[in-house]
């Protein structure tokens, strides 16, 4: 009997097993759309970035003006640039919702998949930070100076490490060149890591909203979830295009319209909105090294979830107190984002410190409450 080409061709077989004949749980909700949306975001970013790189010049005297040239003189350059800048925001919206879904429904119990996901998150954050430096505006330059300077908090090696990263004694041409190099290569590394992420996910199959084994009740990915994903694509692309065409600079920083000047410090140095929560955590610790450790831990703490699970049921759908705690933690992250954009003065400092403690406490207390709830129902 002749097999369809998708089942016999060595290359098509891989794609078929991942996208067409993949058995998927019948009851996965729209919260499971974000994986494919992230794939779409990555493709949009790589394509727009590729065309931007053709016209961009990684030189401190020309970078700002090359971005200006892209927006004014290159055919649809303004569209490429605004799509790329706002595409990054949508990437982070999707990635945070994707992680939040994983925490809520206990998807972190797929340990290798989860750990690779956290590594991808770190890589994407690094990529976005370096991309923000490239236009060489005021906030680009000072953001790069402040964040790279954090490495100087590392005992003994600190200053040597910072100067090695800068390629000199300050953020200069060497820094911009290497940031452009890394910003170009990292998305392809993220793409490779995504393949590994999917490889591990397909070893176990997807989780589902009730957290039970769904092997007895699965349907093929195509056509059911391909069409469901396309609905998600349509909604996201519509919102992205609307933002790009109506208010492309809404999420940017006005300071970045001023060329970088090492002699003038902006009143408020802050990163893009999607890093503000981590920036607020960094500023909440009065000690420099402590702040750096807290900054890294704000993301790295996700890695403890698979190893610190004490509940009988997967996810927190069946734990009412934990649900309240989860949504409180979400509000905490939103408030931290707000605090990150405020000046360093009272009452913002104290609020930031309280929120930081609340953020970290969630990860430590949550499993204990699930255990207590299980014991209560025994």
From Swiss-Prot:
Signal peptide: none annotated. Its cofactor is heme b. A ubiquinone binds at residue 202. Keywords: Electron transport, Heme, Iron, Membrane, Metal-binding, Mitochondrion, Mitochondrion inner membrane, Respiratory chain, Transmembrane, Transmembrane helix, Transport, Ubiquinone. CDD domains: cytochrome_b_C, Cytochrome_b_N. Heme b b562 binds at residues 84, 183. GO terms for molecular function: metal ion binding; ubiquinol-cytochrome-c reductase activity. Binds 2 heme b groups non-covalently. It is found in: Mitochondrion inner membrane. GO terms for biological process: mitochondrial electron transport, ubiquinol to cytochrome c. InterPro entries: Cyt_b/b6_C (IPR005798), Cyt_b/b6_C_sf (IPR036150), Cyt_b/b6_N (IPR005797), Cytb/b6-like_sf (IPR027387), Cytochrome_b (IPR030689), Cytochrome_b_C_euk/bac (IPR048260), Cytochrome_b_N_euk/bac (IPR048259), Di-haem_cyt_TM (IPR016174). It is a multi-pass membrane protein. Belongs to the cytochrome b family. Heme 1 (or BL or b562) is low-potential and absorbs at about 562 nm, and heme 2 (or BH or b566) is high-potential and absorbs at about 566 nm. Component of the ubiquinol-cytochrome c reductase complex (complex III or cytochrome b-c1 complex) that is part of the mitochondrial respiratory chain. The b-c1 complex mediates electron transfer from ubiquinol to cytochrome c. Contributes to the generation of a proton gradient across the mitochondrial membrane that is then used for ATP synthesis. The main subunits of complex b-c1 are: cytochrome b, cytochrome c1 and the Rieske protein. This is Cytochrome b. It comes from Drosophila sechellia. The gene is mt:Cyt-b.
């Amino acid at each position: 009997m002749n097999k369809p080409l998708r089942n016999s061709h060595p290359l098509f077989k891989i794609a078929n097993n991942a996208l067409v004949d993949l058995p998927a749980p019948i009851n996965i909700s729209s919260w499971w759309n974000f994986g494919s949306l992230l794939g779409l975001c990555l493709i949009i970013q790589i394509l727009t970035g590729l065309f931007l790189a053709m016209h961009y010049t990684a030189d401190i005297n020309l970078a700002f003006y090359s971005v200006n040239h892209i927006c004014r003189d290159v055919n649809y350059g303004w569209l490429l640039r605004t799509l790329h800048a706002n595409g990054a925001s949508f990437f982070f919206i999707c990635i945070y919702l994707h992680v939040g879904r994983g925490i809520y429904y206990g998807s972190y119990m797929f340990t290798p998949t989860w750990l690779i996901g956290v590594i991808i998150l770190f890589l994407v954050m690094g990529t976005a930070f370096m991309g923000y430096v490239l236009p060489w505006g005021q906030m680009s330059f000072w953001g790069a100076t402040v964040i790279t300077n954090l490495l100087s908090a590392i005992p003994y090696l600190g200053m040597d490490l910072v100067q090695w990263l800068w390629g000199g004694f300050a953020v200069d041409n060497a820094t911009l060149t290497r940031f452009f190099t890394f910003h170009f290569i990292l998305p392809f590394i993220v793409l490779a890591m995504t393949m590994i992420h999917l490889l591990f996910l397909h070893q176990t199959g997807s989780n589902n909203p009730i957290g039970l084994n769904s092997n007895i009740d699965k349907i093929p990915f195509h056509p059911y979830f391909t069409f469901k994903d396309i609905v998600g694509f349509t909604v996201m692309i519509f919102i992205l295009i609307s933002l790009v065409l109506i208010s492309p600079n809404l999420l940017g920083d006005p300071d970045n319209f001023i060329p970088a000047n090492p002699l003038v410090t902006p009143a408020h140095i802050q990163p893009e909105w999607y890093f503000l929560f981590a920036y607020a955590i960094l500023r909440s610790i009065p000690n420099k090294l402590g702040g750096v450790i807290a900054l890294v831990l704000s993301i790295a703490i996700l890695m403890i979830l698979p190893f610190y699970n004490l509940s009988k049921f997967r996810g927190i759908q069946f734990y009412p107190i934990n649900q309240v705690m989860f949504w409180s933690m979400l509000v905490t992250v939103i408030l931290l984002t707000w605090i990150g954009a405020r000046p360093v003065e009272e009452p913002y400092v104290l609020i930031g410190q309280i929120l930081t403690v609340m953020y970290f406490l969630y990860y430590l207390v949550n499993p204990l409450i699930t255990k207590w709830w299980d014991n209560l129902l025994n």
